[in-house]
């Protein structure tokens, strides 16, 4: 069985983010995971498109933007422009899940779907 290792930059020390990204790549991580939180769908707030855009050319790793936001369809094109390869959305975050998935695919991106078990 093949495994995909996708470390989240949410746990990175941003003072040395480039070094930590290189370390993940050197240790076999082909993906980087971006936990994007809006403070509404989930209580925390993290980073958005500017962080992804600033680092996507610094690595060959696949960029997975995990959108923990309300109505993620609003952000699909912006994350594509920022350098995302995959956009993962939450089933519970959207009234138009099928349309959001279609938009992600229309942008040429891969789709991930998260389901909250609670």
Give, region by region, the residue ranges found by the protein language model:
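Glycine-rich, proline-tolerant flexible connector loops at the mouths of alpha/beta enzymes
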Residues: 32-49
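A structural motif
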Residues: 26-31, 60, 84
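N-terminal amphipathic alpha-helix/helix-capping segment at the start of soluble metabolic enzymes
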Residues: 1-11, 18-19
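Short, charge-patterned binding micro-sites
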Residues: 40-42, 68-71, 82
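Conserved anion-binding
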Residues: 13-16, 58, 74-75, 84-118
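Hydrophobic faces of well-ordered beta-strands that scaffold small-molecule active sites
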Residues: 3-8, 32-34, 63-67, 87-89, ...
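Conserved, mostly hydrophobic/aromatic
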Residues: 17, 24, 35, 79
């Amino acid at each position: 069985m093949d495994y995909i290792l996708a470390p989240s930059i949410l746990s990175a020390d941003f003072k040395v983010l480039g070094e930590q990204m290189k370390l993940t790549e050197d240790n076999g991580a082909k993906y980087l995971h971006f936990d994007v939180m809006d403070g509404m769908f989930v209580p925390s707030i993290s980073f958005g498109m500017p962080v992804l855009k600033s680092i996507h050319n610094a690595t060959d790793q696949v960029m997975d933007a995990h959108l923990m936001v309300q109505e993620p369809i609003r952000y699909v094109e912006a994350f594509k422009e920022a350098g995302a390869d995959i956009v993962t959305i939450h089933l519970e975050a959207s009234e138009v899940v099928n349309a959001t998935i279609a938009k992600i695919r229309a942008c040429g991106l891969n789709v991930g779907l998260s389901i909250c078990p609670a």
